Amino acid sequence: FDVIEHVEDDQLAVNELKRVTKNNALVLITVPAFMSLWSHHDVINHHFKRYKIKEVNQLFDSTSDGKKVFDTYFNTLLFSPIYFFRKVSNLLKLGEKRKGSGSDFEAFKPGVLNTILYKIMCFESSILNKKIRFPFGVSIMYNWKKN
């Protein structure tokens, strides 16, 4: 989960992942979505990029050694507040001013927020379990099967 965006040559990383995967095995990855959400959070987490589903498909479609099983955006219900928070944070350079890691998560105290986020993720998970795809989100989930 959330590894490919940390590698400068993402195609090389995916090719190696595919190479070491056993036949008929499944690969499940998640990556951050949409460069429009780029913020200091990505910088301090050493991300090289954020993706669109089309780009993840292209990474895995470089050879005919497997097939996509399922792909979707997720963290959809959080997209609008995160988009707004990151735009304001970028404009005011808030990420650089925060103490600690500078991560988005440091801007909020744990507690009630964790409970709310947990319930949101459980709700989205129940939808994803039915193989319903979200049209946008903060992250991408991609499932691939090697032939």
What is the predicted role of each segment?
Residues 1-39, 52-57, 142-145:
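Conserved SAM-binding loop
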Residues 1, 43-44, 68:
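Conserved short-loop catalytic and cofactor-binding motifs
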Residues 65-76:
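Conserved S-adenosyl-L-methionine
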Residues 42, 56, 61, 85-89, ...:
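A generic structural signal for secondary-structure junctions
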Residues 78-147:
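A C-terminal cap/extension of S-adenosyl-L-methionine-dependent methyltransferases
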Residues 62-66, 146:
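A structural motif corresponding to the C-terminal end of an alpha-helix
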Residues 39-59, 72-74:
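Acceptor-substrate binding/catalytic loop of class I
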